[in-house]
């Protein structure tokens, strides 16, 4: 008779995301994962595979949550400019702990993308998806006369992806809220 799981896989995966986010892939041990996830070694392997497979699942889970948040943000805000403003200024107001963790996907890029083709592919696809979300929002803004049609929506989308990645990297090094707000202000001026 098959044993029932004594843990909730979704909660365990969320715990794994937090461990990898805090420690990075290389500095995360299986013992730490098992403790934080509340799972036994065999249950971890049976449910998620090895450490690398779990890491990939954690990256995808984090990525999917970010994509959903961004889509929801642009669907709920009154204007595209308001959406970008909320995204950038909310990022500048994150706590010191949030800034020190940075972005899990950016950390994965710096830590592993040159050594792991599958992770590099996942990260490139993530960037393209975010650029697509931003470009769609920018095109809506152009269609409604909010943003000049003289600006290339795809180029602006790439600019905002790069701005966010830069803000995440800077915030991790130096929790200077005012500097991050200045960057957000300059970036938003590109929508004028």
Language model feature labels by segment:
Residues 101, 151-170, 183-190:
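Hydrophobic alpha-helical segments that form the core
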Residues 11, 15, 19-53, 57:
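Helix-turn-helix
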Residues 57, 71-101, 153-157:
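Hydrophobic alpha-helical connector segments
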Residues 83, 97-118:
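Amphipathic alpha-helical segments used for helix-helix packing
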Residues 1-7:
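N-terminal intrinsically disordered/low-complexity leader segments
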Residues 60-66:
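Short, basic, alpha-helical segments at the C-terminal edge of helix-turn-helix-like DNA-binding modules
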Residues 86-93, 128-144, 154, 173-192:
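C-terminal peripheral helix-coil segments that are non-catalytic and often amphipathic
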Residues 61, 72, 118-129, 133:
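Short, solvent-exposed amphipathic helices
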